Amino acid sequence: MSLLTEVETYVLSIVPSGPLKAEIAQRLEDVFAGKNTDLEALMEWLKTRPILSPLTKGILGFVFTLTVPSERGLQRRRFVQNALNGNGDPNNMDRAVKLYKKLKREITFHGAKEVALSYSTGALASCMGLIYNRMGTVTTEVALGLVCATCEQIADSQHRSHRQMVTTTNPLIRHENRMVLTSTTAKAMEQMAGSSEQAAEAMEVASQARQMVQAMRTIGTHPSSSAGLKDDLLENLQAYQKRMGVQMQRFK
């Protein structure tokens, strides 16, 4: 796996699924391929994106700044600086300085990532802030190692929290989660459908599923009533794809 592919993988792992994630993936691909060279416009676009947490925006801004060639004196962006200040905690800053000194001795991406993984997310963000604010310089490869270590830690905690939700025994949370997944699957089907005759059929199925979820939420239904909802919808999607001659693995 190439270095930039690895960076893209780690960075996208902390972006919530949805149309915005697809858009960010496209931007990253363009930047890494050298197709997008307007850092100013890119940062303005990033700043106004909804849904993303300030830290995720800060990390993306840091990656764009590292990889898009720009004039030396280009202004640093406040939204990135604020996100990478380790919540203003002096302990984070102290640890960030120690980490920075260690990173100065590293020359490889993986070496930097290994060193960084033993620090807290706050210290890692502060260290990125040091580099972003030009208070310290490391090679691009080492800086990207730091980015990936930070993303790995964030993705780990997101995964733990997601697993807790998926394995929860609380029937109300499970019920709501199934309805949310059904609704987002239906939305994805509508976006994929296009305009052929079969597409109208897929749209109809998706629309019915969303109406059903709406009705269930309005009336208030028994927590077990949502069991299998998403799977039924995915089976319909699978059948639709087969008729369209598209053979894809299940989304489950």
UniProtKB/Swiss-Prot annotation:
<dbReference type="Pfam" id="PF00598">
    <property type="entry name" value="Flu_M1"/>
</dbReference>
<dbReference type="InterPro" id="IPR001561">
    <property type="entry name" value="Flu_matrix_M1_N"/>
</dbReference>
<dbReference type="GO" id="GO:0046761">
    <property type="term" value="P:viral budding from plasma membrane"/>
</dbReference>
<dbReference type="GO" id="GO:0039660">
    <property type="term" value="F:structural constituent of virion"/>
</dbReference>
<dbReference type="InterPro" id="IPR036039">
    <property type="entry name" value="Flu_matrix_M1"/>
</dbReference>
<dbReference type="GO" id="GO:0055036">
    <property type="term" value="C:virion membrane"/>
</dbReference>
<keyword id="KW-0946">Virion</keyword>
<keyword id="KW-0468">Viral matrix protein</keyword>
<keyword id="KW-1048">Host nucleus</keyword>
<comment type="function">
    <text>Determines the virion's shape: spherical or filamentous. Clinical isolates of influenza are characterized by the presence of significant proportion of filamentous virions, whereas after multiple passage on eggs or cell culture, virions have only spherical morphology. Filamentous virions are thought to be important to infect neighboring cells, and spherical virions more suited to spread through aerosol between hosts organisms.</text>
</comment>
<keyword id="KW-0472">Membrane</keyword>
<feature type="short sequence motif" description="Nuclear localization signal">
    <location>
        <begin position="101"/>
        <end position="105"/>
    </location>
</feature>
<dbReference type="Pfam" id="PF08289">
    <property type="entry name" value="Flu_M1_C"/>
</dbReference>
<dbReference type="GO" id="GO:0042025">
    <property type="term" value="C:host cell nucleus"/>
</dbReference>
<dbReference type="GO" id="GO:0003723">
    <property type="term" value="F:RNA binding"/>
</dbReference>
<feature type="region of interest" description="RNP-binding">
    <location>
        <begin position="165"/>
        <end position="252"/>
    </location>
</feature>
<protein>
    <recommendedName>
        <fullName>Matrix protein 1</fullName>
    </recommendedName>
</protein>
<dbReference type="InterPro" id="IPR013188">
    <property type="entry name" value="Flu_matrix_M1_C"/>
</dbReference>
<comment type="subunit">
    <text>Homodimer and homomultimer. Interacts with NEP. Binds ribonucleocapsid by both interacting with genomic RNA and NP protein. May interact with HA and NA. Cannot bind NP without genomic RNA.</text>
</comment>
<dbReference type="InterPro" id="IPR015799">
    <property type="entry name" value="Flu_matrix_M1_N_sub2"/>
</dbReference>
<comment type="function">
    <text>Plays critical roles in virus replication, from virus entry and uncoating to assembly and budding of the virus particle. M1 binding to ribonucleocapsids (RNPs) in nucleus seems to inhibit viral transcription. Interaction of viral NEP with M1-RNP is thought to promote nuclear export of the complex, which is targeted to the virion assembly site at the apical plasma membrane in polarized epithelial cells. Interactions with NA and HA may bring M1, a non-raft-associated protein, into lipid rafts. Forms a continuous shell on the inner side of the lipid bilayer in virion, where it binds the RNP.</text>
</comment>
<feature type="region of interest" description="Membrane-binding">
    <location>
        <begin position="1"/>
        <end position="164"/>
    </location>
</feature>
<dbReference type="InterPro" id="IPR037533">
    <property type="entry name" value="INFV_M1"/>
</dbReference>
<dbReference type="InterPro" id="IPR015423">
    <property type="entry name" value="Flu_matrix_M1_N_sub1"/>
</dbReference>
<dbReference type="GO" id="GO:0016020">
    <property type="term" value="C:membrane"/>
</dbReference>
<keyword id="KW-0694">RNA-binding</keyword>
<comment type="similarity">
    <text>Belongs to the influenza viruses Matrix protein M1 family.</text>
</comment>
